From Swiss-Prot:
<keyword id="KW-1003">Cell membrane</keyword>
<feature type="transmembrane region" description="Helical">
    <location>
        <begin position="379"/>
        <end position="399"/>
    </location>
</feature>
<feature type="transmembrane region" description="Helical">
    <location>
        <begin position="157"/>
        <end position="177"/>
    </location>
</feature>
<keyword id="KW-0472">Membrane</keyword>
<feature type="topological domain" description="Cytoplasmic">
    <location>
        <begin position="1"/>
        <end position="21"/>
    </location>
</feature>
<feature type="topological domain" description="Periplasmic">
    <location>
        <begin position="105"/>
        <end position="109"/>
    </location>
</feature>
<feature type="transmembrane region" description="Helical">
    <location>
        <begin position="179"/>
        <end position="199"/>
    </location>
</feature>
<comment type="function">
    <text>Component of an export pathway for enterobactin.</text>
</comment>
<feature type="transmembrane region" description="Helical">
    <location>
        <begin position="110"/>
        <end position="130"/>
    </location>
</feature>
<feature type="topological domain" description="Periplasmic">
    <location>
        <position position="178"/>
    </location>
</feature>
<feature type="topological domain" description="Cytoplasmic">
    <location>
        <begin position="77"/>
        <end position="83"/>
    </location>
</feature>
<dbReference type="InterPro" id="IPR023722">
    <property type="entry name" value="Enterobactin_exp_EntS"/>
</dbReference>
<feature type="topological domain" description="Cytoplasmic">
    <location>
        <begin position="278"/>
        <end position="287"/>
    </location>
</feature>
<feature type="transmembrane region" description="Helical">
    <location>
        <begin position="56"/>
        <end position="76"/>
    </location>
</feature>
<feature type="transmembrane region" description="Helical">
    <location>
        <begin position="22"/>
        <end position="42"/>
    </location>
</feature>
<feature type="transmembrane region" description="Helical">
    <location>
        <begin position="288"/>
        <end position="307"/>
    </location>
</feature>
<feature type="topological domain" description="Cytoplasmic">
    <location>
        <begin position="200"/>
        <end position="218"/>
    </location>
</feature>
Length: 416
């Protein structure tokens, strides 16, 4: 029973009722947000026939999410985390109701969509940081890798299902149905979350919120270990922005519309396989080195992706990137939670998640700029190999992360 399997162990859902409640709430929430993610751009495009207006809504929501992550990190370290989670979810649901009512109007308001996008982006991310900060208390730090892998699998599964449901709803009932069901799903998530135990933050001195946030920044910059993890996370997210080149590369490979879907599915599929085969990751004696090497491997996969002579080989490279990035992300998540003091968990999780959001935006902008000067193939390769060079430099510079050793957690009978 003590022999560890490569496959993900789902026993945490059975042994930890609080984590099971979070699992259910997260899955329903991801599906709800997926319905929203399909409806908003479609509605704006139908109203304005402007891709710029669609892009503006995404940018505004992303900006609100960034602010929400910063504020949420401070709140999660100051107030009872269960209350922050419930407040954020409930308030987010009110915004979805607003979008539904607006969609039912004879002439929906574009301004209302933008404002409610700001509202929902802010409050959705507010709850994310509180939930991340509370996870070690819910499952125990020794189970964080397992919890992270289960969460990743949930996110990937929900991200595949929700756009399909959203598309069917748009085809049959219109955007109001998407918004209405997103609101209903969000309020349903409150039911399992109400069963969570009290999650008080650790005692700490009262200080101005900005000063508290700056303390989080200082900790991140002063810690070679935690700061290095956050930096790798940002670079990895930048690499995933290669999806903006898919349409152009599809033309280069002369792919059909049906085949293009394989490009978009490859990274989530690889990541799901990475999560499913993460059973032994928690028992790695040198997680920092493994994180660095898996990140380098993922950059190499992106560099090779655009050079492939056939699209099917490109899909294999993307799936490999998904798998390696999943390994790196799980190690990042676990080390961040275990190496950050309890009193800082909210702020550091907020900053880590925020740099993932900004990393994706920066990566997309850089690839867009490269695409204006180079061919799609050259752009994809330049981004991958450029990040690979930066990664090799970080492998040499981040000595503390590279040499970090941990005592593998003890395997209990329930784990096997």
């Amino acid at each position: 029973m003590n022999k560890q399997s490569w496959l993900l162990n789902l026993s945490l859902l059975k042994t930890h009722p609080a984590f099971r409640a979070v699992f259910l709430a997260r899955f329903i929430s991801i599906v709800s947000l997926g319905l929203l993610g399909v409806a908003v751009p479609v509605q704006i495009q139908m109203m304005t026939h402007s891709t710029w207006q669609v892009g503006l809504s995404v940018t505004l929501t992303g900006g609100a999410m960034f602010v929400g992550l910063m504020v949420g990190g401070v709140l999660a370290d100051r107030y009872e985390r269960k209350k922050v989670i419930l407040l954020a979810r409930g308030t987010c649901g009110i915004g979805f109701i607003g979008l539904c009512l607006n969609a039912l109007l004879p002439e929906p308001s574009l301004l209302a969509i933008y404002l409610l996008g700001l509202w929902d982006g802010f409050f959705a991310s507010l709850g994310v940081t509180a939930l991340l900060a509370a996870t070690p208390a819910l499952v125990g730090r020794e189970n964080l890798m397992q919890a992270g892998a289960i969460t990743m699998l949930t996110v990937r599964l929900g991200s595949v299902i929700s756009p399909m449901i959203g598309g069917l709803l748009l085809a049959t009932g219109g955007v109001a149905w998407n918004y209405g069901l997103a609101a209903a799903g969000t309020f349903i998530t409150l039911l399992p979350l109400l069963s969570l135990p009290a999650l008080p933050p650790p005692p700490q001195p009262r200080e101005h919120p900005l000063k508290s946030l700056l303390a989080g920044f200082r900790f991140l910059l002063a810690s070679p270990l935690v700061g290095g993890i956050a930096l790798l996370g940002g670079l990895l997210t930048m690499a995933s922005a290669v999806r903006v080149l898919y349409p152009a590369l599809a033309d280069n490979w002369q792919m059909s519309a049906a085949q293009i879907g394989f490009l978009y599915a490859a990274i989530p599929l690889g990541a799901a396989i990475g999560a499913l085969t993460s059973g032994k990751l928690a028992h790695s004696a040198r997680p920092g080195l493994l994180m660095l090497l898996s990140t380098l491997g993922s950059f190499l996969a992106i560099g090779l992706f655009g050079l492939m002579p056939m699209w099917i080989l490109g899909v294999v490279c993307l799936a490999l990137f998904g798998w390696l990035s999943a390994v790196s992300s799980l190690l990042q998540y676990t080390m961040l939670q275990t190496q950050t003091p309890e009193a800082m968990l909210g702020r550091i999780n907020g900053l880590w998640t925020a740099q993932n959001v900004t990393g994706d935006a920066i990566g997309a902008a850089l690839l867009g700029g490269l695409g204006a000067m180079m061919t799609p193939v050259a752009s994809a390769s330049a981004s991958g190999f450029g990040l690979l060079i930066i990664g090799v430099l970080l492998l040499l510079v981040l000595v503390e992360l590279r040499r970090f050793r941990q005592t593998p957690p003890q395997v209990t009978a329930s784990d096997g």
